[in-house]
């Protein structure tokens, strides 16, 4: 979809004149805002970004203010909770056209912020004439080495995640020349796979979302400053289908079917040729097949092993040997990436990656040794593990009816209760909400059910696994013992569990530097046996049985 189509607005220069046939939404500085054409401003929403630039965004019927702002492609989205009104990341301050506050505004933002004009953009419809101000956007991380133009050919490995996009620029020897990561620009459509699929069911929505990622990749290719010969883009089936503008109807309702098998080179507008890893099943995609390439064709673990790619969609491979594998997938939601939780966020400087128990309570372990700003997924796992050990929580995730330790009694005494449920104050002005515990418990139930089902299908017991390899959200900052105590892993398996980092990105890089492996990976994919959990008539009963910690 070209700039200026669909979500694009009327471009304005600083004098308010239309600049000919130029496409896209134009920004003007705050000093020039007074001369922005009032007619155009009245037809859309005026957004003032953190640098003072004004963006005039068109309003589409039925859209929330969050969708209007962050599906425009003009502003970097925060990590949103799919419009549930829980995370507070979509907060904006109204300068004109302030709507009446809703219950979620008051509960999440607080009375003082609401009086100051702050609202949750996901809870209010976009109305022409509104003027809002945004807080600073999330930063994009980049690492640039000394890129020598004569060191090519250069290739770009991409891990296209639902939440984040990670990339590595490889030189002609296969070494990393630059790298970066950013939130997926499709976040305006929601943080979960199901939200993206809903937005992509029609052609216009699919093109809109695909265009956001294509524009991001075009910018990366342009910014590295050297010719890029080829890409390898590894993503889950939903992200890949949207990127390739393939019909997603088969992923939206049972019986699920896959229209894009991958294992081919795709041509994308304004980009070098992109190889798409094979997608073995409707919700087992190129991200985990690339991860398997990294393990199988690098230094493979002893068989049998399990690879769990813990993203918004959980994908699992139980490899019996180099040719035979059982695969499964379960929707996990973005909780393990810290998204959708009250103080959640991606793992970055200022994120709490763990909690320690001491005689005086909980102390956070912060990435970068700075003041805590948010809690990443592993931080939440560590926190719940600590609260279970003290007796503050019971196995169902509820507050304990009777304290079993002095520390639990002290913590229970600090609990605050309100219309939205209970919350526990934490260091750094943060808090844990009862709803956060429930979200993590859902992830635990899905994870342990998938593992149990794969073991049953393969005829193995957990003690037969030589290794459990964790990728995705748990690949970098794995809680050392929490997974077993929380019940994600059977007893005795934690000692054989390894955080493998970003296996998807590592595999994409390998498939660029050793293209002869691509056909082998396609053969591996075609030989996988799917364990279809969603098709089981007893799925709900089994899932509920796993809705306990430990």
Regions found by a protein language model. Give the residues of each.
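Local cysteine-cluster metal-coordination motifs and their immediate loop/turn environment
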Residues: 76-98, 114-127
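Catalytic phosphate/nucleotide-handling subdomain of diverse soluble enzymes
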Residues: 460-463, 467-524
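Short glycine-aspartate micro-motif
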Residues: 155-159, 228-232, 305-309, 325-327, ...
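Fe-S ferredoxin-like electron-transfer domains
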Residues: 33-36, 40, 45, 59, ...
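N-terminal phosphate-binding loop and adjacent alpha-helix
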Residues: 185-224, 340-343, 351-356, 439-442, ...
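Glycine-rich phosphate-binding loop of actin/hexokinase-like ATP-binding domains
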Residues: 167, 174-192, 250-265, 290, ...
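ATP-dependent carbohydrate kinase catalytic cores
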Residues: 256-325, 359, 402-451
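Acidic, glycine/GT-rich loop-and beta-edge segments that sit at the periphery of enzyme/chaperone cores
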Residues: 39-46, 118, 277-289, 510-550
């Amino acid at each position: 979809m070209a700039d200026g189509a669909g979500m694009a607005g009327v471009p304005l220069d600083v004098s308010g004149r239309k600049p000919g046939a130029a496409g896209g939404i134009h920004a003007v500085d705050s000093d020039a805002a007074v001369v922005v054409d009032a007619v155009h401003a009245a037809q859309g929403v005026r957004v003032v970004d953190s640098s003072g630039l004004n963006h005039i965004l068109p309003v589409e019927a039925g859209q929330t203010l969050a969708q209007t702002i962050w599906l425009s492609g003009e502003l970097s989205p925060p990590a949103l909770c799919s419009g549930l009104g829980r995370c507070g990341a979509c907060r904006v301050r109204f300068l004109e056209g302030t709507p009446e506050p809703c219950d979620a505004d008051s509960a999440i933002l607080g009375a003082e912020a609401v009086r100051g004009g702050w609202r949750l953009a996901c809870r209010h419809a976009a109305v022409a004439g509104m003027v809002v101000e945004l807080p600073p956007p999330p930063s994009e991380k980049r690492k640039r080495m000394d890129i020598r133009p004569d060191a090519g050919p250069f290739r770009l490995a991409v891990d296209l995640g639902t939440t984040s996009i990670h990339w590595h620029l490889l030189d002609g020897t296969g070494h990393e020349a630059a790298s970066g990561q950013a939130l997926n620009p499709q976040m305006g459509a929601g943080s979960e796979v199901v939200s993206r699929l809903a937005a992509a069911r029609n052609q216009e929505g699919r093109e809109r979302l695909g265009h956001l990622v294509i524009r991001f990749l075009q910018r990366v290719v342009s910014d590295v400053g050297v010719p890029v010969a080829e890409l390898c883009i590894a993503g889950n089936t939903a992200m890949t289908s949207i990127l390739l503008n393939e019909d997603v109807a088969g992923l939206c309702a049972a019986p699920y079917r896959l229209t894009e098998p991958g294992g081919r080179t795709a041509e994308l507008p304004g980009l070098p040729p992109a190889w798409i890893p094979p997608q073995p099943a409707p919700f087992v995609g190129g991200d985990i097949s690339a991860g398997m390439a990294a393990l199988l064709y690098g230094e493979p673990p002893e068989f049998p092993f399990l690879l769990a790619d813990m993203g918004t969609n959980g994908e699992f491979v139980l490899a019996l040997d180099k040719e035979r594998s059982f695969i499964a997938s379960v929707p996990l939601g973005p909780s393990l990436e810290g998204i959708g939780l009250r103080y959640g966020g991606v793992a970055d400087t200022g994120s709490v990656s763990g909690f320690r128990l001491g005689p005086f309570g909980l102390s956070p372990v912060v990435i970068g040794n700075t003041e805590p700003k948010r809690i990443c997924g592993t931080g939440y796992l560590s926190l719940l593990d600590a609260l279970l050990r003290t007796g503050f929580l019971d196995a169902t995730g509820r507050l304990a009816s009777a304290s079993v330790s002095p520390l639990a009694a002290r913590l229970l005494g600090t609990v605050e209760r309100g219309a939205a449920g209970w919350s526990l104050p934490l260091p750094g002005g943060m808090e844990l909400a009862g709803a956060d515990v429930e979200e993590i418990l859902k992830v635990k139930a899905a994870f342990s059910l998938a593992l149990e089902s794969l073991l049953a299908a393969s005829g193995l017991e957990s003690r037969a696994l030589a290794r459990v390899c964790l990728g995705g959200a748990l690949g970098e900052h794995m809680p050392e013992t929490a997974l077993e105590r929380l019940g994600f892993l059977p007893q005795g398996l934690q000692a054989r569990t390894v955080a493998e980092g970003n296996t998807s990105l590592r595999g994409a890089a390998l498939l660029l530097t050793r293209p002869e492996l691509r056909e082998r990976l396609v053969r591996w994919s075609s030989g996988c046996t799917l364990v279809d959990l969603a098709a089981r008539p007893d799925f709900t009963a089994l899932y509920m049985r796993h809705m306990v910690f430990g």
